[in-house]
UniProtKB/Swiss-Prot annotation:
It comes from Human herpesvirus 2 (strain HG52) (HHV-2). Residues 348-359 have a biased composition (Polar residues). The lineage of its organism: Viruses, Duplodnaviria, Heunggongvirae, Peploviricota, Herviviricetes. Residues 323-336 have a biased composition (Basic and acidic residues). Belongs to the alphaherpesvirinae glycoprotein G family. The keyword Membrane applies. Residues 23-650 are virion surface. It is a single-pass type I membrane protein. Glycoprotein G is much larger in HSV-2 than in HSV-1. GO terms for cellular component: membrane; viral envelope; virion membrane. It is found in: Virion membrane. The chain crosses the membrane at residues 651-671. Residues 376-390, 403-447, 483-531 have a biased composition (Low complexity). This is Envelope glycoprotein G.
Length: 699
């Protein structure tokens, strides 16, 4: 009685520990045992179709044989067997093996499966059985013991061993081929198993024995709750300490070479029933939404599991190959936009009064038809253009077509420089995006003035003007007028004449040419009107436009024949004060000039001005004096040949040597003192005795 009580107490304690069937570590069957799981085609209930943890089988007892075993003398080769299904799910591939040892005898078994691809023969599962009953297939219940299950993929692996068969999840059209090696006593059974989903039947690569299977694979329902929360992952997938190979890489074996436990990178310590549940859980996580709890979906169409957020094992994107060879493989949003050809690059200096311009390396080709002036023979000759005195700023206006989208976009003010632009001044008046319409209404109401008798010489070297010869269809020649509207002939696409670049008057600001854009009604023709040139009423007179003031931005050519439609028809602009602008109003001589709105300063640093200045030269950046090297650093001369690091190492070596020398001297002195004291004690330990003969005493 006293011996039984401790055993009962120990059994009671062990029954409550985590990891046992009756404890709280791993729960029992949560769902009914396969009562709600059926094949989509109406086949019988599958005992392996579940996705929750079960502990129905006894656990493994130890590791498999570490050494690589040789092939037995007798090898039985089976014909390849293939199965094709219409839907996805879990499929049990059973090898065609019938003889399992002699009756009334025991045998040992070794089951190994390989996954075959075009370039690799990868071992995926390995298990050994011992003490199996003859006449029955090896399993955890018919054998006395079995080893851990070694896995070649994962974690966790998507395949599972069911006795001597292979449980495979299928969900895509790609066919999979497996090789099995089952050793039963002294016989080795070898063969191939093939499976696919989708299609009308076995494909061209299927074995001859492949046929359409009845029904279809089973689909496990999603378990309620979180049954795998209490199952440690080390049970069903842990690193194999005896693995000989590279981690996270397939282990490929030569043909007909048996695998050893050292060829598989992972090992599972859980029983077979738990590993089957892991395979079902992996399938529903990869191929089905997790919110469909307890719902058995209908027949899945072929290829329904290929896409979507739950598509299993998507192909690895080949970023390097796409970026190197295939331009279409690169995302167009990531690709940098190609810098187009601009008319000119403009920038503004915040410290100076006059804006500066940077030349563009690639000039814009302007067709001759676009630059040809529009002339109507029936139109009355208008007054010739006039010029301003040499000390005043000479400007030119060209009629261009501006779309409503372009007028709605605001752009920073800039001035087109004739000296820096490689095109003529007339070519600089092409339309562009991002510029407003600056037509003047007051110029259309003012009568023309008397032309000047002389024409000042041009000052531009890049845009040298050519004199215009008066003809029967042209207006009298004249230099560039400083008006905001068409002083020169407006270009049209149907005119055979060519445009002559205007001349610029000499002066302190003769290099700066302000370009104004006006809007004309397409389909009409007329003559260009000349704005007034009186100093008091001229919009760019000395009282209103001082030298160096910013001018309207130059238009930018965008290309396309539709932008030049109706341009240069010579129609007077509408009388609209909103389109006149502040710079084109007649100033009052008795009042100070109106305050001009401050120019919009660029917010980007020089050299990063966006599409307007792709080739803007940067100012030379000078490094601070403290960052500039003063001269070559003298090479360190070590105190000893073995000290080559730094002068600090020399000092540290000297200090350390001094300390150690002093310590050594102290130790030697202490040892000498102790030795001297011990020698003195030894000398006085045995004192010499002398006997002296005393004389006798006298009475």
């Amino acid at each position: 009685m006293h011996a039984i009580a401790p055993r009962l107490l120990l059994l009671f304690v062990l029954s409550g520990l985590p990891g046992t069937r009756g404890g709280s570590g791993v729960p029992g069957p949560i769902n009914p045992p396969n009562s709600d799981v059926v094949f989509p085609g109406g086949s019988p209930v599958a005992q392996y179709c579940y996705a929750y943890p079960r502990l129905d089988d006894p656990g493994p007892l130890g590791s498999a044989d570490a050494g690589r075993q040789d092939l037995p003398r007798r090898v039985v080769r089976h014909e390849p067997l293939g199965r094709s299904f219409l839907t996805g799910g879990l499929v049990l591939l059973a090898p065609p093996v019938r003889g399992f040892g002699a009756p009334n005898a025991t045998y040992a078994a070794r089951v190994t499966y390989y996954r075959l691809t075009r370039a690799c023969r990868q071992p995926i599962l390995l298990r050994q059985y011992g003490g199996c009953r003859g006449g029955e297939p090896p399993s955890p219940k018919t054998c006395g013991s079995y080893t851990y299950t070694y896995q070649g993929g994962g974690p966790p692996t998507r395949y599972a061993l069911v006795n001597a068969s292979l449980l495979v999840p299928i969900w895509d059209r790609a066919a999979e081929t497996f090789e099995y090696q089952i050793e039963l006593g002294g016989e080795l059974h070898v063969g191939l198993l093939w499976v696919e989903v989708g299609g009308e039947g076995p494909g061209p690569t299927a074995p001859p024995q492949a046929a359409r299977a009845e029904g279809g694979p089973c689909v496990p329902p999603v378990p309620a709750g979180r049954p795998w929360r209490s199952v440690p992952p080390v049970w069903y997938s842990a690193p194999n300490p005896g693995f000989r190979g590279l981690r996270f890489r397939e282990r490929c074996l030569p043909p007909q070479t048996p695998a050893a436990p050292s060829d598989l990178p992972r090992v599972a310590f859980a029983p077979q029933s738990l590993l089957v549940g892991i395979t079902g859980r992996t399938f529903i996580r990869m191929a089905r939404p997790t919110e469909d709890v307890g719902v058995l979906p209908p027949h899945w169409a072929p290829g329904a599991l290929d896409d979507g957020p739950y598509a299993p094992f998507p192909p690895r994107p080949r970023f390097r190959r796409a970026l190197r060879t295939d331009p279409e493989g690169v995302d167009p949003d990531v690709r940098a936009p190609r810098t187009g050809r601009r008319l000119m690059a403009l920038t503004e200096d915040t410290s100076s009064d006059s804006p500066t311009s940077a030349p563009e390396k690639t000039p814009l080709p302007v067709s001759a038809t676009a630059m040809a002036p529009s002339v109507d023979p029936s139109a009355e000759p208008t007054a010739p253009a006039t010029t301003t005195p040499p000390d005043e700023m000479a400007t030119q206006a060209a009629t261009v077509a501006v779309t409503p989208e372009e007028t709605a976009v605001a752009s920073p003010p800039a001035t087109a420089s004739v000296e820096s632009s490689p095109l003529p001044a007339a070519a600089a008046a092409t339309p562009g995006a991002g510029h407003t319409n600056t037509s003047s209404a007051s110029a259309a109401k003012t009568p023309p003035t008397t032309p000047a008798p002389t024409t000042p010489p041009p000052t531009s070297t890049h845009a040298t003007p050519r004199p215009t010869t008066p003809g029967p269809q042209t207006t009298p020649p004249g230099p560039a007028t400083p008006g905001p509207v068409g002083a020169s002939a407006a270009p049209t696409a149907d005119s055979p004449l060519t445009a002559s670049p205007p001349a610029t008057a000499p002066g302190p600001s003769a290099a700066n040419v302000s370009v104004a854009a006006t809007t004309a009604t397409p389909g009409t023709r007329g003559t260009a009107r000349t704005p007034p040139t009186d100093p008091k009423t001229h919009p760019h007179g000395p009282a209103d436009a001082p030298p160096g003031s910013p001018a309207p931005p130059p238009p930018e050519h965008r290309g396309g024949p539709e932008e030049f439609e109706g341009a240069g028809d010579g129609e007077p602009p509408e009388d609209d004060d909103s389109a006149t602008g502040l710079a084109f109003r007649t100033p009052n001589p008795n009042k100070p000039p109106p305050a001009r709105p401050g120019p919009i300063r660029p917010t980007l640093p020089p050299g990063i001005l966006g599409p307007l200045a792709p080739n803007t030269p940067r100012p030379p950046a000078q490094a601070p004096a403290k960052d500039m090297p003063s001269g070559p650093t003298p090479q360190h001369i070590p105190l000893f040949w073995f000290l080559t690091a730094s002068p600090a190492l020399d000092i540290l070596f000297i200090i350390s040597t001094t300390i150690h020398t002093a310590a050594f001297v102290c130790l030697v002195a202490l040892a000498a003192q102790l030795w001297r004291g011990r020698a003195g004690r030894r000398r006085y330990a045995h004192p010499s005795v002398r006997y002296v003969c005393l004389p006798p005493e006298r009475d």
